[in-house]
């Protein structure tokens, strides 16, 4: 009876170890999904000491395939623990296979604290379904 219990416990430990290895391998593969209409994108969010924030947006599509994008920028302020208050919500519609811009927002009227920026690109074109690319970053001042 003891051998049977020990065998079952050992089997459970081996299974748990194997699943952790599989999960770790899947997590750190670094493989990016293939996009239909966009070759690359870059986004960044920063806030100066005076409360001026900048959101850098940049995408490069495929020639004769990418037609444009809808870029949604949302900035929220952490008000208490896990509660967030939206302070910026802007949507920009752009045309073309490439786009680069820096959006500036004055957050000083909302006071110092922790802010979270979410940017969502919805990039359209003839390459297939729209590509949806999310971005999230926290910054404080």
Language model segments and positions:
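Surface-exposed, short loops/turns at beta-strand junctions within beta-sandwich domains
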Residues: 99, 105-114
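Positively charged n-region of N-terminal signal peptides that target proteins for export
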Residues: 1-5
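Short, surface-exposed binding/anchoring microloops in extracellular/periplasmic proteins
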Residues: 36-75
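Solvent-exposed serine/threonine-rich low-complexity stretches and specific carbohydrate-binding patches
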Residues: 73, 84-98
